[in-house]
Amino acid sequence: MNWRSEHVWVELLKGSRKRGNFFWACILFLGSLGFLSVGASSYLGKNIISILPSQQILFFPQGVVMSFYGIAGLFISSYLWCTILWNVGSGYDRFDRKEGIVCIFRWGFPGIKRRVFLQFLMRDIQSIRIQVKEGLSPRRILYMEIRGQGVIPLTRTDEKFFTPREMEQKAAELAYFLRVPIEVF
């Protein structure tokens, strides 16, 4: 959801709570439980789950490897579930022409720097940059160049739903709102 008026533009960012992340976290969790149960079944010599026959699988080396894959999958799955729970990457971009201030806020991982908050003056914005990479894995990223701080990405690198036309339109609207030029590289 985005909100825009004559003097204020607020753009909310979704973060890691996306349908794809939920899907992959579930698939990875269930798959790693399957590997771990087959490894445990081969160690015990009994079928823990009747769907997965494990009498043909010897514990050493196949059962050990499957147990290792199961444990590794559980760790990766727990990492994904934690990023979803903490909603890492969500936040907002707020551009206020009336006060001349830009605020960028993002949630990170728990710790000292969980809240990433950047605030600077609009007059320090030099330009809006668009980075376009076509090919096998196309990327379109929108940056804001700040005097003395370099470039700050405004869109996530994994957002592939932007067509070139949508990216150009968003960059043009933002550059018009901020009254700065657009650069393409």
Swiss-Prot record:
Topological type in the membrane: Multi-pass membrane protein
Locations listed in the record: Plastid, Chloroplast thylakoid membrane
Record field: transmembrane: 20-40, 57-77
Entry-linked InterPro entries: PSI_Ycf4_assembly (IPR003359)
Gene Ontology cellular component annotations, sorted alphabetically: chloroplast thylakoid membrane; photosystem I
GO biological process, alphabetically ordered: photosynthesis
Major subcellular location class: plastid
Keywords carried by this UniProt record: Chloroplast, Membrane, Photosynthesis, Plastid, Thylakoid, Transmembrane, Transmembrane helix
Family: Belongs to the Ycf4 family.
Function: Seems to be required for the assembly of the photosystem I complex.
Protein name: Photosystem I assembly protein Ycf4
Record organism: Lolium perenne
Gene: ycf4
